[in-house]
Amino acid sequence: MFGVLNSNDHRAAVQQRNTPAFGRTSFELWTDNPTSNYRCETGGNGRDSGQNRVRRPMNAFMVWSRDQRRRVALENPQMQNSEISKQLGYQWKMLTEAEKWPFFEEAQRLQAMHREKYPDYKYRPRRKALPQKRDKLLPAASSSMLRRQVLVDEKWYPFTYRDSCSTAAHSRMEDQLSSSQPVNIANSLLQQEHHYSSTSFRDSPETLATHLSADPPFYPK
């Protein structure tokens, strides 16, 4: 026989199940998961975050512009960062070699410290995302067959052509469509259709016969 729990015992059991282990914080419970630890160290997406990435040592211009950029930004709050960079680049070019020399010395000192701290450091520029080609964006069609409709005597008739049809032949079709002889257009298009169909089914006579019998002849009114 199963014992019946009263309301107090049931409430205590629910609270104990929802309460973390005694003497342990929620941070300790969260770090029990190795996947969570890895995400925390790498920035959440499995890659090295910007904080863990070793930065290049500053050059002379960066040492000089570090304080100058802050000053220009305070004097011109509405100026964009790109405009500030252009202005600083122009000012740096206007400095003499004697004025630039202290910043070159500071840059050399920072580079020496960087080599001591990171002896195996190698500069790895970030790869720029290349735009995908248009042919890769479009899904590959299962068949290279294209269909169009031809207007003859105010009636639409389907017309099929394949990749074997050259651009010149297709342009001739367009010229024929613009002419004033709809009956001749229909006959020429049907002849080309049967020509390409017979070419594609040349290896199979039975299939060719079935294909030709399935298409009824066209008699213009």
Curated annotation (Swiss-Prot):
GO terms for cellular component: cytoplasm; nuclear speck; nucleus. It comes from the Eukaryota. Coiled coil: none annotated. Transcriptional regulator that controls a genetic switch in male development. It is necessary and sufficient for initiating male sex determination by directing the development of supporting cell precursors (pre-Sertoli cells) as Sertoli rather than granulosa cells. Involved in different aspects of gene regulation including promoter activation or repression. Binds to the DNA consensus sequence 5'-[AT]AACAA[AT]-3'. SRY HMG box recognizes DNA by partial intercalation in the minor groove and promotes DNA bending. Also involved in pre-mRNA splicing. Residues 54-122 bind DNA. Interacts with CALM, EP300, HDAC3, KPNB1, ZNF208 isoform KRAB-O, PARP1, SLC9A3R2 and WT1. The interaction with EP300 modulates its DNA-binding activity. The interaction with KPNB1 is sensitive to dissociation by Ran in the GTP-bound form. Interaction with PARP1 impaired its DNA-binding activity. It is found in: Nucleus speckle; Cytoplasm; Nucleus. GO terms for biological process: cell differentiation; male sex determination; sex differentiation. Keywords: Activator, Calmodulin-binding, Cytoplasm, Differentiation, DNA-binding, Nucleus, Sexual differentiation, Transcription, Transcription regulation. Residues 194-221 are annotated as: Disordered. Its main location: nucleus. Belongs to the SRY family. GO terms for molecular function: calmodulin binding; DNA-binding transcription activator activity, RNA polymerase II-specific; RNA polymerase II cis-regulatory region sequence-specific DNA binding. This is Sex-determining region Y protein.
